[in-house]
């Protein structure tokens, strides 16, 4: 009751931020977003305060009546005047922006790197430099990685581990991440459409197991198709897509419907995911079936039909020194009964993991 009767005490306790821009733009609206949670900062959504800077950023802005605590500031140039931070197909901001603490992310923004303490009654000045995320031509990543997979095939080697180069290119409209590529076709804010391509390794070599001998090796191939990305409330991302064999080696394709959400734990960004993967009849037959001409007593003819499997996994990202970053991705695919029942299969699930240390240029 005492605090209610003495409102000036609130003014004494309230903190204030003054936000200035090192390089105010010649035109456009500059927007300040204030965050107090890593769960929303990681994908730059749902800030606790949003204000436009006066005079297009040439005059510092003020955020008043703040409680003491930990905050992070993001400032962006609203180039098209739509009142929101535009992002590309994979969720990277496509408008110039800047962060408190002179922080510049090397991947998903990390809250502790941009966060600062604000004490009761304190007035703190934050200066930010605006810069485009992609520069003039996007950025490249180069490093070393290791992939590890298990085989579901009867009598085959359980684990396969091999080193690979980790190469990537990230641009506003085009992204190449290892063996996958995307090109943006349509961006409507929370919904985006892209053309996609991916390299699919052959499922097996006949020398992998005596149960596969005489069936011939399965060829690598190139898939191509389309994908839809939808940003849902609370930071969930829904993706759906289909890719078909462009080289005609399997005459089939795969569809995918998945959900993913990013969390932060300290300096780690952790993104659990779950997906349903559809394998067309011809692709399932190519990778899991046994043609009648190749049947034998211990390997009867088998036609699995199309199949839907469940995939559960996660990706972990951590910024290291300067432009270096660490990426770990792992998933397990649970095979449906019509694939598990194949005479050349003796596993009910497949593990797949990828680890890399890369540098961004």
Model-identified regions with their sequence ranges:
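A short tyrosine-centered beta-strand micro-motif
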Residues: 69-75
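Acidic, glycine-anchored loop motifs typical of Ca2+
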Residues: 78-87
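Outer-membrane beta-barrel "beta-signal"
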Residues: 121-127, 139-141, 164-170, 348-361
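Residues that define the transmembrane beta-barrel architecture of outer-membrane proteins
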Residues: 138, 159-165, 189, 218-224, ...
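Transmembrane beta-strand segments that form the barrel wall of outer-membrane beta-barrel proteins
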Residues: 142-152, 174-183, 207-213, 236-246, ...
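Transmembrane beta-barrel strands of outer-membrane/channel proteins
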Residues: 142-148, 180, 195-199, 240-244, ...
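Repeated loop/turn-to-beta-strand initiation elements of outer-membrane beta-barrel proteins
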Residues: 173-176, 191-193, 234-238, 266-270, ...
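Outer-membrane beta-barrel transmembrane domain signature
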Residues: 185, 246-338, 344, 359-361
């Amino acid at each position: 009751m005492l605090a209610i009767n003495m409102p000036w005490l609130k003014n004494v306790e309230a903190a204030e931020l003054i936000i200035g821009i090192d390089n105010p733009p010649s035109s456009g609206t500059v927007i300040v977003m204030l965050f107090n949670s890593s769960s929303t900062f990681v994908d730059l959504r749902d800030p606790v305060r949003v204000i436009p800077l006066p005079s297009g950023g040439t005059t510092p802005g003020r955020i008043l009546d703040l409680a003491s605590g930990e905050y992070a500031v993001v400032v962006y140039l609203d180039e098209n005047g739509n009142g929101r931070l535009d992002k590309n197909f994979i969720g990277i901001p496509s408008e110039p922006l800047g962060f408190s603490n002179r922080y510049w992310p090397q991947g998903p923004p990390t809250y502790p790197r941009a966060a600062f303490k604000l004490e009761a009654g304190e007035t703190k000045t934050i200066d930010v430099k605006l810069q485009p995320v992609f520069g003039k031509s996007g950025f490249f990543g180069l490093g070393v990685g290791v992939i590890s997979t298990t085989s579901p095939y009867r009598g085959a080697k359980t684990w396969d581990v091999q080193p690979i180069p980790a190469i990537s290119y990230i641009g506003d409209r085009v992204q190449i991440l290892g063996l996958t590529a995307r090109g943006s076709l349509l961006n409507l804010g929370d919904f985006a459409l892209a053309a996609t391509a991916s390299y699919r390794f052959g499922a097996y070599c006949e020398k992998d197991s005596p149960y596969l001998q005489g069936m011939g090796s399965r060829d690598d191939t190139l898939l191509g198709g389309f994908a839809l990305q939808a940003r849902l409330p609370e930071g969930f991302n829904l993706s759906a897509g289909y890719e078909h064999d462009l080289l005609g080696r399997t005459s089939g394709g795969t569809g995918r419907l998945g959900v993913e959400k990013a969390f932060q734990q300290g300096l780690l960004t952790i993104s659990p995911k779950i997906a349903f993967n559809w394998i067309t009849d011809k692709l399932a037959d190519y990778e899991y079936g046994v043609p009648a001409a190749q049947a034998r007593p211990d390997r009867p003819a088998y036609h699995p039909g199309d199949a839907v499997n469940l995939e559960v996994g996660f990706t972990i990202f951590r910024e290291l020194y300067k432009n270096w970053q660490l990426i770990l991705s792992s998933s397990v695919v649970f095979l449906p009964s019509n694939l598990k029942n194949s005479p050349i299969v003796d596993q009910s699930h497949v593990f797949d993991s990828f680890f890399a240390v890369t540098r961004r240029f």
